[in-house]
Amino acid sequence: MKNDQIVFEKTKNIAHDINQMQNQQEIIDYLFRQDSLTLNQLKHYYSEPSLPLQFLVKVAVLCMFISMTLASFLFIQAKEVFTNTILSDISPAVFSIFTVICIFMTYTKIIKKGNKNKGKASLNQRSEFYEKNKLINTILYKKYKMDQQNIQANKHTASDNEDSMNFSAVLNHVLTISKNDKELLGYLDTRDNAMLSQLKAYFSTRPFSLPHYMSLMFCGSIIVVYATSLFSGQINYIDIPHIFIFLLLIIFLKILIDLIKLLNISRKGQLHTVLHFAQRAEYLRMRGVIDFILTERYNKKIM
């Protein structure tokens, strides 16, 4: 995690320096002086989704727990929370109406807007990131092309013994020589298309499957329902002290503060996941080299 933080801060500072440059040629010259690892770290920095999955899961969990506390206070524990008889009698009905309104507003918002993102600031930032990524891709292609041309004419070719190497052996060798672009390019160029495709699949991001997400949300919902029943005193065989109401209030305030912090962070621009940042950038570089080799091969066949 410490290394990821260091790499992320370095990449963030480089991106900040690039933003200060007004001339595109100055940006091109600056990027061309960077090595491929730094360029791929920048590319990964600009390529991350505006709302990473970890952020969405965290928000979903926080929202479930804040719903739990609201339901416990205003619906189930209303008579114990509010000493005023009028408030304790009216709060369950008000909470029920509030819940129905929230459901209706959410449904109408989804119907009207769908998945469209019309935010002008978000559009400008995404277009800027697309432009930076295209520039980085062009520079990387140029660098790989130069490395390919500099590889000796009598370059190493795959022998029969190497052809029999399984995927694990090839992968281990690739990870060993991954820091040297020229050596990596020369070695991968001796592999066939099937092996390169397997390597690219390995270095690609594992998709977060729908069943996995559903299982997490299902387990989270069960925990929230159980906690709501427990804190509200609905489980007869477990005696809950009165102090748990104050504990529930503390949980509510803590979650509310966390949600406000997340909203403020999201308004500042694109969110980034620091965890495994260095590894994800390195895997992106591997995929870039493989894409370059495959593209060159296919271009020769098409021409």
UniProtKB/Swiss-Prot annotation:
<keyword id="KW-1003">Cell membrane</keyword>
<keyword id="KW-0472">Membrane</keyword>
<feature type="transmembrane region" description="Helical">
    <location>
        <begin position="92"/>
        <end position="111"/>
    </location>
</feature>
<keyword id="KW-0812">Transmembrane</keyword>
<dbReference type="GO" id="GO:0005886">
    <property type="term" value="C:plasma membrane"/>
</dbReference>
<feature type="transmembrane region" description="Helical">
    <location>
        <begin position="240"/>
        <end position="257"/>
    </location>
</feature>
<feature type="transmembrane region" description="Helical">
    <location>
        <begin position="208"/>
        <end position="230"/>
    </location>
</feature>
<keyword id="KW-1133">Transmembrane helix</keyword>
<protein>
    <recommendedName>
        <fullName>Uncharacterized protein YbfF</fullName>
    </recommendedName>
</protein>
<feature type="transmembrane region" description="Helical">
    <location>
        <begin position="55"/>
        <end position="77"/>
    </location>
</feature>
